[in-house]
Structures are given as structure tokens and as C-alpha cells.
Amino acid sequence: MAVGAQVAAPRTRSPRLCCALVRRLIVGNSGSGKSTYATRSAAAHGLARLELDSIVWEPHKVAVARPAEDVRADLDSFLATHDRWVIEGCDGDVVLLALHACTELVFLNPGVAVCLENDRRRPWEPHKYDSAEEQNKWLPYLLSWVEEYYTRDGPRSYAFHRQLFDDFDGAKREVTEGTVDP
């Protein structure tokens, strides 16, 4: 061990943090690490977790949007049911609907190369696709969509996420590299 190096004590869950009001909203491109970070946050802090894809898209129908009123009803139900939560997604218009209730906004922005690599290594998502083969069939489309993040317009674009983040007055952080502690 190097001179002056410190060994960190094992982490324990702080009662203050354990019971704190945590309402974390995570936004970013596909492959930016939103789901991974949300899962870790939920486990570390005992939070309910909502993946926006689960309410925005028709189950097992790739890129078929549900009616906006159904999405809003499901989001409102989640917010009313859970005091402590983490919500993640790239759907900026839906993120806007939950923004008033969050205690922290996290913008995961690691760059296109990281997002592409993460999407290429993504395991099968049975809640989205009927099979790994079906998921792999859609991969070229997803990779193309990820590459367009910084140039496209609309609520799933970098420009929208950047504006949302910059305009938010509450606690927020942008992560551009590395991993983030839950």
C-alpha cells in the first residue's frame, strides 16, 4: 500500500440516507447506463423503480407507443403510490411530467461511443422482446437511433435533455464518464 493511502471503511447504510426522501429522475440516451444506475439506486436505498419504457411502449411491440393518456395515468399512479422512487428513461416529455416531484435529476451523458458499446453488450430484455433473436434483429435500428441522439430533435434528443437539465432548479448532476454511486 502506498504511503498516505487510506483504506475506506466498509460501507454501511446510513439510517438518515435509508429513510431520506429520495425521488431520483434519470435521463439520457439509450445505452447511457440509466437502467443499471436505477437498479443500483433502487437496491441501495430501497426505492421503487420505474423504467419509462414499460409505460411508454406497448408490451412486446417494438416502437409502438401507448396512448398518451394511458402513459400519464400509469405515471400518476406510480407517483401517488410510492413516496421514494427512481424513474429512468429517455422520453423527455414523460420525464417533464415527473420533474415536479423529483428531489434529484441525473443526466447520464457518457457520449455516443459508450452508449453504442453498452447497447451492443446489452443482455436480452425479456420484458421488451419475446426472444434474444428478436432483440438482436432490432439492434441495427437501435444503434442508428443512438448515433442520432446529438443531431435529432424532439423529446428523446440531446438538445431536449440538455435544456431540461439546464432549466431544472433543483438538485442535479450530469455524469459524463465513469460510474456513479447509487
Spans of features found by a protein language model:
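Short, structured coil segments at secondary-structure junctions
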Residues: 45, 101-102, 168
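The conserved Walker
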Residues: 30
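Hydrophobic anchor at the beta1->P-loop junction of P-loop NTPases
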Residues: 26
